Every structure is written in structure tokens, then in C-alpha cells.
């Protein structure tokens, strides 16, 4: 994505992102499982693309590789309920993503490329598929008011109440 206003895209782990095909990833997974017996994998991409995760899920299912896995995403609209079901079938147990703030005004200023409603729909799709959702949240973004923060807390409370997210972590805004 590399567009969020607070993200330092010059950092090596962001600017030098190197993709691997689903086939290569599953080759590596099979090798690790064979060598270590490890069957739990955390993919630590900053925001794994939906197409890449779909390809990974399809390859895991095609090869009948049984693992548990989780990763980090942006709450993109292409994470449909159908894709969430496919990911769950392939062993996905959790997703983490940056909701950041529950304010469309602030999300726009942040250039997150998502809306509050979109986040609610995507997280609900994951949760309905049995995938746990963790939301990263922040406070103190420039121009964020006390009322923005209060509204965000209430919205996050509703996301928990409606089963859209199962965990969340608030941190103070700081530029990277």
C-alpha cells in the first residue's frame, strides 16, 4: 500500500517488500513442517494483499497442507465474506489490521484507503468465517479531537459487541 500518511516507506521492511508466489511459499511451508514439525505460521507482511492470500489459500488446499496461519492486512473491500471462508478453510485462524481511528475524516487524512463501514463489513466477514480479528488503533493523530477519540472508543465497543473484532490495542500516535 505504502500510502498511509504516517508510514515511513523508506524503511527497509516496507520499501524493499519482496513477494513470493503461492507455490514458493507452500514449498517453504512444507519444508519447515517436514524439518521441524512446526504447523503454525505468522506471516508478518505489513499488509498482505487479498490476491496473494487467496492464492496462498488455494495452494494450501490444493496440496492438502494442514497448518494454522495468521497475518496482517489492510481492511480492503476485496476481503469478501467468500474470501474469508476460503482463508479459514486453508487454516487461517486470525488477522490483524490497522483500523487506526474510527473516523472517516481522520482515515481520509491518514490516506488509509478504507472507511469505517468497510472495516466493519470486512471484520464481520472474517469473524463469521471463524477467523479472529485484532485491530490496531491509535489516538493523538493531528487534528484528532477529544470527541473523535470518544466516538472511536464507542465505535470499537460496538465492534466488540457485534462480534466483529475480538481484540484491539490502542497506542499513542507517533510518526515512523
For each predicted feature, which ranges?
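Hydrophobic, well-ordered secondary-structure elements that form the walls
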Residues: 43, 97, 135, 156, ...
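Conserved SAM/AdoMet-binding glycine-rich loop
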Residues: 26-132
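Alpha-helix N-cap and loop-to-helix initiation/capping positions
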Residues: 16-24, 110-117, 144-148
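Acidic/polar loop patches that form or flank catalytic/metal-binding clefts of enzymes
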Residues: 39, 68, 134, 163-170
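An active-site-proximal structural segment forming one wall of the substrate-binding cleft
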Residues: 32-33, 158-160
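Catalytic cores of alpha/beta
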Residues: 82-84, 143-158
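Canonical Radical SAM [4Fe-4S] cluster-binding loop centered on the CxxxCxxC motif
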Residues: 1-21
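Flexible glycine/acidic-rich beta-alpha junction loops that bind and position SAM and/or redox cofactors
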Residues: 53, 105-110, 139-147, 163-176
